């Protein structure tokens, strides 16, 4: 069992590793938010899954604890019941969703790596919410294309969260806009992409950050002028853009 000090070091270290993922100006301020309003109210299962994920070599991919709290609040505010998640990893945001929606709520969860999902599955099962999850391994686009063919799927989702391959974000949006209901919400994660969206051309960015930055910028420009949605870009985690379908 990790000590409180271990947990602090894990969170702080990860925060530094990704270059202020919370986009705040100091680690101390981010730690204040976590210790004051996030960790004290974090569900025990969420805490356990966060600690399990911290030991995984790709833990940089997980949803931050403050973003998990935000998603939980949002889901409850909009009374979401039928939801979708593209990009699962070990399931931290998935668990946040499963805990927030009603007992008869559903989550269609898609990821290309089932092994990562199974790492968090025991925690999800222990929390008693695994019955809400329909996990499908593989690329999401073919699944979405099949769903769109059936009219009954149009406008059937209350909430959709996307945290997957950034080079396909626009492709996802073109399909998801038909699947989310009018008044429903789509959340796109990483839309400030480690702050690189405002980095100068010659900035010393990591190769993967530089590669995906153009796709993130393209998405942000498209969402900003899409008349079918209202948007709100928030500096939570690595940036999340909330899109509410209005027509």
From Swiss-Prot:
Cofactor mode of binding and number, as noted: Binds 1 divalent metal cation per subunit. Fully active with Ca(2+), Mg(2+) or Zn(2+) ions. Active at 35% with Mn(2+) ion.
Coiled coil stretches, renumbered: none
Catalyzed reactions: (E)-caffeoyl-CoA + S-adenosyl-L-methionine = (E)-feruloyl-CoA + S-adenosyl-L-homocysteine + H(+)
Keyword Amino-acid biosynthesis included in the entry's annotation: no
Cofactor: Ca(2+); Mg(2+); Zn(2+)
EC code: 2.1.1.104
GO MF annotations, alphabetized: caffeoyl-CoA O-methyltransferase activity; metal ion binding
Family matches, as Pfam families: Methyltransf_3
Positions contributing to S-adenosyl-L-methionine binding: 63, 85, 87-88, 93, 111, 140, 165
Record InterPro entries: Cation-dep_OMT (IPR050362), SAM-dependent_MTases_sf (IPR029063), SAM_O-MeTrfase (IPR002935)
GO biological process: lignin biosynthetic process; methylation
UniProt keyword list: Calcium, Lignin biosynthesis, Metal-binding, Methyltransferase, S-adenosyl-L-methionine, Transferase
SUPFAM superfamilies, per the entry: S-adenosyl-L-methionine-dependent methyltransferases
Record: residues binding substrate: 21, 163, 194
Pathway: Aromatic compound metabolism; phenylpropanoid biosynthesis
Binding-site residues for a divalent metal cation, renumbered to this chain: 163, 189-190
Annotated function: Methylates caffeoyl-CoA to feruloyl-CoA and 5-hydroxyferuloyl-CoA to sinapoyl-CoA. Plays a role in the synthesis of feruloylated polysaccharides. Involved in the reinforcement of the plant cell wall. Also involved in the responding to wounding or pathogen challenge by the increased formation of cell wall-bound ferulic acid polymers.
Assembly with partners or alone: Homodimer.
Stated family: Belongs to the class I-like SAM-binding methyltransferase superfamily. Cation-dependent O-methyltransferase family. CCoAMT subfamily.
Name of the molecule in the record: Caffeoyl-CoA O-methyltransferase
Lineage: Eukaryota, Viridiplantae, Streptophyta, Embryophyta, Tracheophyta
């Amino acid at each position: 069992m990790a000590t409180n000090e271990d947990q602090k070091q894990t969170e702080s270290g990860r925060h530094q590793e990704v270059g202020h993922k919370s986009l705040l100006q100091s680690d101390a301020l981010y730690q204040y938010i976590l210790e004051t309003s996030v960790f004290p109210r974090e569900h025990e299962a969420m805490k356990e899954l966060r600690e399990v994920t911290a030991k995984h070599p790709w833990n940089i991919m997980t949803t931050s604890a403050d973003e998990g709290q935000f998603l939980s609040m949002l889901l409850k505010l909009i009374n979401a019941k039928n939801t979708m998640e593209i990009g699962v990893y070990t399931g931290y945001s998935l668990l946040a969703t499963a805990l927030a929606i009603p007992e008869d709520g559903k989550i269609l969860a898609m990821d290309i790596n089932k092994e990562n999902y199974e790492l968090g599955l025991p925690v999800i099962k222990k929390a008693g919410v695994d019955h809400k999850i329909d996990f499908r391994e593989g690329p999401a686009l073919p699944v979405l294309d099949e769903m769109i063919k059936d009219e009954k799927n149009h406008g059937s989702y209350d909430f959709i969260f996307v945290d997957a391959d950034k080079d396909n974000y626009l492709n996802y949006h073109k399909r998801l806009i038909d699947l989310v209901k009018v008044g429903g919400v789509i959340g796109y994660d990483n839309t400030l992409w480690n702050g690189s969206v405002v980095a100068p051309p010659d900035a010393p960015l990591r190769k993967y950050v530089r590669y995906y930055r153009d796709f993130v910028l393209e998405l942000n420009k498209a969402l900003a002028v899409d008349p079918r949605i209202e948007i709100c870009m928030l500096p939570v985690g690595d940036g999340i853009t909330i899109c509410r379908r209005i027509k």
